[in-house]
Amino acid sequence: MNVFFMFSLLFLAALGSCADDRNPLEECFRETDYEEFLEIARXXXXTSNPKHVVRVGAGMSGLSAAYVLAGAGHQVTVLEASERPGGRXXXXXXXXEGWYANLGPMRXXXXXXXXXXXXXKFGLNLNEFSQENDNAWYFIKXXXXXXXXXXDPGLLKYPVKPSEAGKSAGQLYEESLGKXXXXXXXXXXXXXXXXXXXXXXXXXXXXXXXXXXXXXXXXXXXXXXXXXXXXXXXXXXXXXXXXXXXXXFDEIVDGMDKLPTSMYQAIXXXXXXXXXXXXXXXXXXKVTVTYQTPAKXXXXXXXXXXXXXXXXXXXXXXXXXXXXXXXXXXXXXXXXXXXXXXIFLTCTKKFWEDDGIHGGKSTTDLPSRXXXXXXXXXXXXXXVIIAYGIGDDANFFQALDFKDCADIVFNDLSLIHQLPKEEIPSFCYPSMIQKXXXXXXXXXXITTFFTPYQFQHFSEAXXXXXXXIYFAGEYTAQAHGWIDSTIK
């Protein structure tokens, strides 16, 4: 399973009992009110008691809430600090050359029903997202092997136990999580989640599932799960359950930002861009939100309720007057966020097709880590390759300038595809680099992830409301890094 492409749509959920189901883990994470949210997404109900609501942040979470509230007849004001709506779901397009690239989320899980309903409502076309390709390459420990052949970690010079030989790193990773899951099936889901939240994914794989240490290293390098090694096993199990159930992913044709843009156009009159919220003060039953406009004047909007739907780090920057509960403040400060760097090359010649690669990704332990060949069929001859790093892998590129980053990617590609290094720049040029950490409004994070113990300590506190001020950013969802749970 690709822990790496953590950006796409997916649905997950709350903790009911899960003793007797086909996939007990999936039941554990299914939120009891998911169907209710889906109904709201399909057809908005009208309200008999309209109120004025201020939304802070026009990312996926803010836009979808504002869209539903406005549809129900409430008066909505959306404040967005940057110049454009959509937050981390963004795309860069060069209309002249006929290519586009998703800078944020790249895929939507077919099982992500809330996102699919919204896409259907706006008439957006979906295209299958190719995640794997048997002809793609692994270039690890200075040896190149085709993905189809790299079934066996022994081929990549990892010493493994006899019982582990002949299995791919992804299989070993899923089996070890599966053992942990089987142990959980006997207990109730709440107990299972608490137990799983206590250990790191790497510790669980080595201790509970008795995988050899070298097998854990192989999974880290080949399944690119290294970045998530410190994440709590609960988060890893949740992602595995959701993604394994539906292996099919889609992408929105012409860019993932079509979804937020369509929502924004429907409520454009109520949204103010380049307005950064500074303080939210609750007095009696009203909330006053103070914000900076481009004219540098501080303006205030009074409303019946305010929902701050910003990224976790940005939530800490806005001051709430009836101070948020201490537990909520601690949770917002302590949730760890992962950074990402994505480096895009635009190519006039699809040199990877010579190796039979159409979409999917190659994996390496060189700095580029995962090089994905975008399957988005561009009309012109140009195509896009993305080198994608998350967490510590992304930090490697943060301090380097555009040219140095591109040189490293060219060098890594020449090794992976076994081409002369000077040949690739002759038909590819670096078109774009997206360092999520450097973006001002996102405040340095692309996705939240819980480290051990945080799930049981923080998941409720993070979503607690303070008087009439509500928090609904991505970090309050049960699954982090997926548009579907963010919309909810």
UniProtKB/Swiss-Prot annotation:
It catalyses: an L-alpha-amino acid + O2 + H2O = a 2-oxocarboxylate + H2O2 + NH4(+); L-leucine + O2 + H2O = 4-methyl-2-oxopentanoate + H2O2 + NH4(+). Keywords: Antibiotic, Antimicrobial, Apoptosis, Cytolysis, Disulfide bond, FAD, Flavoprotein, Glycoprotein, Oxidoreductase, Secreted. Signal peptide: none annotated. Belongs to the flavin monoamine oxidase family. FIG1 subfamily. Its EC number is 1.4.3.2. This is L-amino oxidase. Gene3D superfamilies: 3.90.660.10, Guanine Nucleotide Dissociation Inhibitor, domain 1. Monomer. This is in contrast with most of its orthologs, that are non-covalently linked homodimers. It is an enzyme of class 1 (oxidoreductase). One of its GO terms (cellular component) is extracellular region. Its cofactor is FAD. It comes from Trimeresurus purpureomaculatus (Mangrove pit viper).
